[in-house]
């Protein structure tokens, strides 16, 4: 058995986990802790404190850290922290011979292979093809996209910046939304991430509200107004995207319901755009924090219709398996699996 250290490092919270891996690549969780990232000047003292508290007689041989941000030449700088991470320095200061830094969405790609059936909700069974490409898309704070290609006997994960591609409206309401965002932000283009993400949920709500296309409820209106008043502040006391999503699932706010309907339509369409580019008959996996929370709405929506509504290509997309990832720790699982490969 080999002892591994896996980490999911965010600007706010970091989760560290010790894992043992057998020759069959089966993972066994040993110890886990969560930390507030800002409480530490660097990752090294956090890991050192973690290992002392874990009180494990052996020392990790390999480590992989999933980073909320780009990784360039084995280095990473987190957006909301002063940390600058370098694999060579980390290996030396932590006495761990093999260390890797990967983008957090790449970690999701690796994590797919550590999920059980209970960790997935299948929207479309499709016709799975062994060794075919796999696609991942995930709306959360932003919109992540990536893909996996089989090379030899293993899949290699390739993150992308597809979430920053142009938002492509398909009907009059979406064209109005595009115009609204262009005017509001005084910009020349709108990325799909401005619509299909947590910030997109709020933007759609504001659009429908300002165009008086639905009536606000006092409860959600107060949350959104508070958030708008706190614009520019580092710390916000409310999460309007979460409040809107919850109200939509509960059916307690008509404007929130319409917001999620437009959001899910756009989400399905963008997932279909990604699928067209790759034809991922190995599966298209929907990650991110939003989909599991609004699963009842997605299940009973036109997500799949918008996913497959691509003209003459529709029959191809109807054969692609589509799954929603329910396990919020898929990135941590992926970091452990990535460490096992080192």
Swiss-Prot record:
Gene3D superfamilies in the cross-refs: 3.30.420.40, 3.40.367.20
Cross-referenced Pfam families: Glucokinase
Binding residues annotated for ATP, in chain numbering: 7-12
Catalytic activity: D-glucose + ATP = D-glucose 6-phosphate + ADP + H(+)
Domain of life, source organism: Bacteria
Membrane spanning residue stretches: none
Keywords: ATP-binding, Cytoplasm, Glycolysis, Kinase, Nucleotide-binding, Transferase
EC primary class: transferase
EC number of the protein: 2.7.1.2
GO molecular function: ATP binding; D-glucose binding; glucokinase activity
Entry-linked InterPro entries: ATPase_NBD, Glucokinase
The keyword Transmembrane helix belongs to this UniProt entry's keyword annotation: no
Compartments in which it is found: Cytoplasm
GO terms, biological process: glycolytic process
GO cellular component, one term: cytoplasm
Signal peptide boundaries: none
Family: Belongs to the bacterial glucokinase family.
Stated name of the protein: Glucokinase
Organism: Trichormus variabilis (strain ATCC 29413 / PCC 7937)
